[in-house]
Amino acid sequence: MFISISAGIVTFLLTLVGIPAFIQFYRKAQITGQQMHEDVKQHQAKAGTPTMGGLVFLITSVLVAFFFALFSSQFSNNVGMILFILVLYGLVGFLDDFLKVFRKINEGLNPKQKLALQLLGGIIFYLFYERGGDILSVFGYPVHLGFFYIFFALFWLVGFSNAVNLTDGVDGLASISVVISLSAYGVIAYVQGQMDILLVILAMIGGLLGFFIFNHKPAKVFMGDVGSLALGGMLAAISMALHQEWTLLIIGIVYVFETTSVMMQVSYFKLTGGKRIFRMTPVHHHFELGGLSGKGNPWSEWKVDFFFWGVGLLASLLTLAILYLM
């Protein structure tokens, strides 16, 4: 436990030092920052804010987790799988950000390219993961999927990777939402005695807390796709490594809600010839524009943050209660 906590403290301190250096480099190199293409007027002031800050907490967390696990003899197949997903999905996000920032391609990777790279990473992940079994936990009951587990694994990894990416649209929202989710999985890992997974979790929590100091409103830096895609993939990988896949539907209710809102909006828009359910999706923008109803007073970014963090915290506590108190 001491090793895991130490890993978290080290990544926190490294990120605390690394982010200002990253921002300074970004400014000195005169790199064009985040472009704003949203209809939320208050976001226009954020244009030019340095992005790709997720690169800092990703590198520090992966390296610290790797070396701490290695030298404490806790490096395992689980640790390797989770770090692999972090690196690979981080690379996909980095390429996407690179095209947007340096090549001025607003779309970055097109959806097919991004999906292909995410699926490739998922397949490689499965080749290692299958050693751990092909059993899917459905609300605590084992379901043997055999070869078909690969299809679930790909859906889980790609789905939650993109879901966290969609959530990253308000200052600080995604970073603390993931901290809450990881904290819940940290408890599960500790109870299961999987200290290797706990080490990776605490390392990332430390990195995210260090990043949040510069990412809360008004954000001095954004994590970019390099951070959000990696974090979503990490959550999916951890849920599988702990054989508690179903828990991510509750622990990750914020990401599920954000993604579902987009799917509902697009489907309803097509079916009705242009009508909308929400004022704007992902749904956190709906709240920004008009509160819960969409017709009330606009919510500040802090209010949106605390609402979603509260939902995420309650969902995480509910999951732990279901697992260990019922």
Curated annotation (Swiss-Prot):
The protein's GO terms of the molecular function aspect are: metal ion binding; phospho-N-acetylmuramoyl-pentapeptide-transferase activity
Keyword Transferase in the entry? The reply is yes
Q: Which cofactors, by name? A: Mg(2+)
Where does the record say this protein resides?
Cell membrane
Q: Which gene encodes it?
A: mraY
Positions of disulphide bridges: none
Enzyme Commission number(s): 2.7.8.13
Chief place where the protein resides: membrane
**Which controlled-vocabulary keywords does the entry list?**
Cell cycle, Cell division, Cell membrane, Cell shape, Cell wall biogenesis/degradation, Magnesium, Membrane, Metal-binding, Peptidoglycan synthesis, Transferase, Transmembrane, Transmembrane helix
Q: What is this protein called?
A: Phospho-N-acetylmuramoyl-pentapeptide-transferase
Oxidoreductase keyword on record:
no
Function of the protein:
Catalyzes the initial step of the lipid cycle reactions in the biosynthesis of the cell wall peptidoglycan: transfers peptidoglycan precursor phospho-MurNAc-pentapeptide from UDP-MurNAc-pentapeptide onto the lipid carrier undecaprenyl phosphate, yielding undecaprenyl-pyrophosphoryl-MurNAc-pentapeptide, known as lipid I.
Q: What class of enzyme is it?
A: transferase
Give the family from UniProt. Answer: Belongs to the glycosyltransferase 4 family. MraY subfamily.
According to its UniProt record, which reaction does this protein catalyse?
A: UDP-N-acetyl-alpha-D-muramoyl-L-alanyl-gamma-D-glutamyl-L-lysyl-D-alanyl-D-alanine + di-trans,octa-cis-undecaprenyl phosphate = Mur2Ac(oyl-L-Ala-gamma-D-Glu-L-Lys-D-Ala-D-Ala)-di-trans,octa-cis-undecaprenyl diphosphate + UMP
Cellular component per GO, a single term: plasma membrane
Q: In which pathway does it act?
A: Cell wall biogenesis; peptidoglycan biosynthesis
Q: Which GO terms describe its biological process?
A: cell division; cell wall organization; peptidoglycan biosynthetic process; regulation of cell shape
**Spans traversing the lipid bilayer:** 3-23, 51-71, 79-99, 115-135, 138-158, 169-189, 195-215, 221-243, 306-326
